[in-house]
Amino acid sequence: MSGAKSAQGPEEGGVCITEALITKRNLTFPEDEELSEKMFHTLDELQTVRLDREGITTIRNLEGLKNLHSLYLQGNKIQQIENLACVPSLRFLSLAGNQIRQVENLLDLPCLQFLDLSENLIETLKLDEFPQSLLILNLSGNSCTNQDSYRELVIEALPLLLDLDGQPVMERWISDEEDEASSEEEFPELSGPFCSERGFLKELEQELSRHREHRQQAALTQHLLRMEMQPTLTNLPLLPGVPMAGDSSPSTTPGQGEETVPEAVSSPQASSPTKKPCSLIPRGRQNSLWGRKGVRASTVPKASVAEAPSTTKTMAKRSKK
């Protein structure tokens, strides 16, 4: 991995894999003077490298990862499968969600058992480019899966395949279980670490399924939060004097109906020759009542308004007498 100092590819100006990027995503070091030497030895010991969603366009600079068995490169901008012969021990490779158009350069990975190429741009299926060691393969989201007898052709070409596009190859699971039972009876020594590979892959597939469900749940949660914000913004209280959209008639609450103008005018204590009749209405509610069209017509009877001048004249005559 010497010479990989910049994340920019020299040919196309794209983003490629570098020591710095691998270290940033997969390693943590205390600050000291021997950091570069420690980083070199630690990179050599890495077995799992995660470089998903980094905008990577080119696969390169993996020569220093001698013990690598799991490589996560999903969600990048990779267009070509290349430069993987330097990691022959690779068993797990995720290239989902890239821009890959054809399957190539995978025969240099004799130990590859899990390959995820879902959500790419693969149109033509080249079955002779897949390693025979594959146990789990995912090509969903590519147009090549629409060709006739796609599933049958892939299963026939890969004799060890146990799962295709998230669907188990049932006949092989059943036959393998029977073979495993008979093998344990005839050769009990083979039930140890030699046959532990399938259990590892089951756990690996379950972990990927959990990650998928977690991402879907997170996206759903964000969507629901956005939906909850919308009614909060639209159901804000109206400003005084502003009617609701689509409401042509003024609405009167029970509290407003009790504090109407006729009660204050017809009350003997409120009537006076010097002061105009008024009602005790809160300032905000008063603006709302008088700002709406037709409030006075609907809440103040004409007879009660007309009685106010006559009451004043009667009081004036009595004072003269």
Curated annotation (Swiss-Prot):
Pfam family of the protein (one): LRR_9
Coiled-coil spans in chain: 198-222
Statement: the UniProt record of this protein carries the keyword Repeat: yes
Keyword Nuclease attributed: no
GO terms of biological process kind: maintenance of cell number; single fertilization; sperm axoneme assembly; sperm flagellum assembly; sperm mitochondrial sheath assembly; spermatogenesis
Modified residues (Phosphoserine): 175, 182
GO CC, alphabetical: sperm midpiece
Highest taxon above the source species: Eukaryota
Signal peptide: none
LRR repeat copies, ranges: 45-66, 67-88, 89-110, 111-132
Ranges for region Disordered: 235-321
Localization (cell): Cell projection, Cilium, Flagellum
Main location: other
UniProt keywords, alphabetically: Cell projection, Cilium, Coiled coil, Differentiation, Flagellum, Leucine-rich repeat, Phosphoprotein, Repeat, Spermatogenesis
Domain LRRCT residue range list: 142-184
Function: Required for normal spermatogenesis and male fertility. Plays an important role in sperm flagellum biogenesis.
Protein name: Leucine-rich repeat-containing protein 46
